[in-house]
UniProtKB/Swiss-Prot annotation:
GO molecular function term, any single one: ion channel inhibitor activity
Domain of life: Eukaryota
Pfam families reported for this sequence: Conotoxin (PF02950)
Taxon lineage: Eukaryota, Metazoa, Spiralia, Lophotrochozoa, Mollusca
Protein name: O-conotoxin GeXXXIA
Keyword Iron: no
Organism name: Conus generalis
Signal peptide residue numbers: 1-22
Length: 74
């Protein structure tokens, strides 16, 4: 019985700590830049490459296919 009470109190305490942290971050007091959203879509700022152009990932190409052998958009 005592162990159950201790576990319940511990869980409630940890939940309260999580909620307090969430409220602090939602007020815009971010400590890390990675937690903040830039508000812009990366895809809108980037131009897609045409067929035969150099690519490193499928997302670089218009048709979403980057040939790994030649590193060129197809």
């Amino acid at each position: 019985m005592k162990l159950t009470c201790v576990l319940i109190i511990t869980v409630l305490f940890l939940t309260a700590c999580q909620l307090t942290t969430a409220v602090t971050y939602s007020r815009g007091e971010h400590k890390h830049r990675a937690l903040m959203s830039t508000g812009t879509n990366y895809r809108l700022l980037k131009t897609c490459r045409g067929s035969g152009r150099y690519c490193r990932s499928p997302y670089d190409c218009r048709r979403r296919y980057c040939r790994r052998i030649s590193d060129a958009c197809v």
